[in-house]
Amino acid sequence: MRYTGLMGTLLTLVNLLQLAGTLRIAAFNIRTFGETKMSNATLSVYFVKILSRYDIAVIQEVRDSHLVAVGKLLDELNRDKPDTYRYVVSEPLGRKSYKEQYLFVYRPDQVSILDSYQYDDGCEPCGNDTFSREPAIVKFFSPYTEVQEFAIVPLHAAPTEAVSEIDALYDVYLDVWQKWGLEDIMFMGDFNAGCSYVTSSQWSSIRLRTSPIFQWLIPDSADTTVTSTHCAYDRIVVAGALLQAAVVPNSAVPFDFQAEYGLSNQLAEAISDHYPVEVTLRKI
């Protein structure tokens, strides 16, 4: 028994050391995240529990133009230790009255923000813009990872325009490269990249998929939905030799918080209809 206990302790220490030696990044579509959800004590506990797993988390479907819910979320994330997390948030995005924001929360002791910008996808009033919610792009610096500078490009694609919007991320890649001279770019979010929104015959028309520049880390067979559907809507795609080499093999997965925390269907779906998708990067 003593031997078994010692081995268990050693395995735990090894796991902790492995975790400490990585940077964990996630994208999480929290369905209709705003004041109502954040005011629910039960839901807020799970938002904090889930997001605390990550060094960087990109939250989509944020509907909080006055940042009341965002402020409460950061207060809870920083409750035990001030300045554990900081945030940067996009302007409200959308073609009509319905707007969403992209929210990045990150640990300042692990990464810092070097720059950011809103991708210009054309004239919205003219009707020739590309995205329903154009990406808000952030360049991070981490002194501890094998790749020290990298950009994250989030996308919450409109379901009926998923094919064209995912394809247009190739143009975003070129724009980031031209602006910053940076090839190490991570695209992540709810692409609606599966089931009826992107069929098997449509992948050949998506440059982000057909170009050898990009590695798709979440496979088509994955299920990133909380409900009874089985769809790989949420994805992580990486470009750049340094970033691709820094990815820990097999670390890109959906995080099934329902199974992890033993939640009922009702509670899990109240949190969101999507699981986060996550990936880890090696530290030096």
UniProtKB/Swiss-Prot annotation:
SUPFAM superfamilies assigned: DNase I-like
Cofactor: Ca(2+); Mg(2+)
Entry EC no(s): 3.1.21.1
Tissues and organs where the protein is expressed, per its UniProt entry: Highly expressed in the parotid and submandibular gland as well as in the kidney and duodenum (at protein level). Expressed at intermediate level in the ileum, mesenterial lymph nodes, liver, ventral prostate, epididymis, ovary and stomach (at protein level). Expressed at low level in the sublingual, preputial, coagulation and pituitary gland (at protein level). Also present in the lachrymal and thyroid glands, striated muscle, intestine, the urinary bladder and the eye.
Modification comment: N-glycosylated.
Reactions that this protein is recorded to catalyse: Endonucleolytic cleavage to 5'-phosphodinucleotide and 5'-phosphooligonucleotide end-products
Gene Ontology MF annotations: actin binding; deoxyribonuclease I activity
Active-site residue list: E100, H156
GO cellular component, one term: zymogen granule
Any single GO BP term: apoptotic process
Places the protein is found: Secreted; Zymogen granule; Nucleus envelope
Lineage top rank: taxon: Eukaryota
Site for Involved in actin-binding, residues: E35, V89
Stored Pfam families: Exo_endo_phos
Traits of the deletion mutant: Mice develop symptoms of the autoimmune disease systemic lupus erythematosus, characterized by high titers of anti-nuclear autoantibodies (ANA) directed against nucleosomes and double-stranded DNA, the deposition of immune complexes in glomeruli and full-blown glomerulonephritis. Mice lacking both Dnase1 and Dnase1l3 show vascular occlusions following bacterial infection: defects are caused by the formation of intravascular neutrophil extracellular traps (NETs) clots that obstruct blood vessels and cause organ damage.
Signal peptide limits: 1-22
Disulfide bonding pattern of the chain: C123-C126, C195-C231
Cofactor: binding comment: Divalent metal cations. Prefers Ca(2+) or Mg(2+).
Glycosylation sites: N40, N128
Function: Serum endocuclease secreted into body fluids by a wide variety of exocrine and endocrine organs. Expressed by non-hematopoietic tissues and preferentially cleaves protein-free DNA. Among other functions, seems to be involved in cell death by apoptosis. Binds specifically to G-actin and blocks actin polymerization. Together with DNASE1L3, plays a key role in degrading neutrophil extracellular traps (NETs). NETs are mainly composed of DNA fibers and are released by neutrophils to bind pathogens during inflammation.
PANTHER family: DEOXYRIBONUCLEASE, DEOXYRIBONUCLEASE-1
Name this protein carries in UniProt: Deoxyribonuclease-1
Originating organism: Mus musculus
